[in-house]
A protein has these predicted regions:
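N-terminal leader/capping segments at the start of a protein or of a new domain
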Residues: 1-41
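A short hydrophobic beta-strand segment most commonly corresponding to one strand
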Residues: 91, 142-158
Length: 170
């Protein structure tokens, strides 16, 4: 646990408010640099890992005007809604399990989206979804999934959600 507390402290203090820190949302490069410092073998997320039988569980760690850090716990079969992040970038760090990210494009009707691609991310993988990216995060495996999400600026509440539309020719 000390490593995770230190990781959060570095994000808050050094990157955002410490000497030479920034008082603005993080850039993609700053988010990736922070994630590169994470040693998954030393991270103990147990105090931030609560699962739910009903839906994936968002466990807030730290939030201010410039970023939001969340540990999300997914049981087998749990999925997020199809959504975008508004003006936020979202860095995902998979700490355990396999995350499936389904990428969508805007549909022919407002609030509709069509699946165009599916990607799998495993332990230690890092990816960023920028604001306009429409996607869904899924745990299609039979194992639990734990992901760290760094949103900058914080995720809008509520996020923009979409309904799936049938792919052409189906």
């Amino acid at each position: 646990m000390p490593h995770f507390v230190g990781m959060v402290s570095r994000l808050r203090d050094r990157i955002l408010t410490g000497p030479g820190g920034v008082e603005r949302p993080l850039t993609r490069e700053e988010m990736l640099a922070w994630a590169a410092e994470v040693d998954l073998d030393a991270v103990d997320l147990s105090c931030h890992c609560e699962f739910s039988d009903d839906a994936y569980a968002r466990n807030g760690v730290l939030k201010n005007d410039h970023f939001e850090l969340v540990v999300i716990c997914w049981k087998a079969g749990q999925v997020s809604p199809i959504h975008d992040h508004g003006e936020s970038n979202c860095l995902y760090l998979v700490t355990g399990g396999t995350m499936t990210e389904e990428i969508y494009r805007r549909g022919d009707q407002p609030e509709r989206a069509a699946l165009v691609e599916s990607r799998e991310w495993g332990r230690g993988d890092v990816t960023i979804a920028d604001g306009p990216t429409i996607h869904r995060v899924c745990n299609h495996s039979s194992e639990d999934l734990v992901t760290i999400h760094l949103y900058s600026p914080p995720l809008p509440d509520p996020p923009n959600t979409y309904s799936a539309e049938e792919a052409a020719g189906s």
